[in-house]
């Protein structure tokens, strides 16, 4: 269940400001978590593969500035990598997007 469904002040009249504020906070938490997870994945893989940011940018066709912003995820709270960027990273390292964002996939067996 999504966090936004657990507490949704938007359902009640007169809570417009609270709704906007909570939506902003919720998106900040989600975005920060995503950016940090991609950063952690890249730190690990760049070290394992013994490659640098510039090389990764060249071979994936991701702008170097984007790679740098990902690597500064904690310092730059407003940045969130785009899906296309995450996909390019996953393709290069031959893994899934779920692995890049460290998302645990539930098995529905």
Curated annotation (Swiss-Prot):
Keyword annotations for this protein, in alphabetical order, are: DNA-binding, Transcription, Transcription regulation
UniProt xrefs under PROSITE patterns: HTH_CROC1
Q: Which InterPro entries match?
A: Cro/C1-type_HTH, Lambda_DNA-bd_dom_sf
Q: Which residues bind DNA?
A: 53-72
CDD domains associated with the record: HTH_XRE
* UniProt entry tagged with the keyword Transcription regulation: yes
Question: Recorded GO terms, molecular function?
Answer: DNA binding
Is the keyword Transcription assigned to this protein?
A: yes
According to the entry, every stretch annotated as the HTH cro/C1-type domain falls at: 42-100
Q: Which Pfam families match?
A: HTH_26
Q: Which cysteines are joined by disulfide bonds?
A: none
Q: What is this protein called?
A: Uncharacterized HTH-type transcriptional regulator RC1195
Gene source species: Rickettsia conorii (strain ATCC VR-613 / Malish 7)
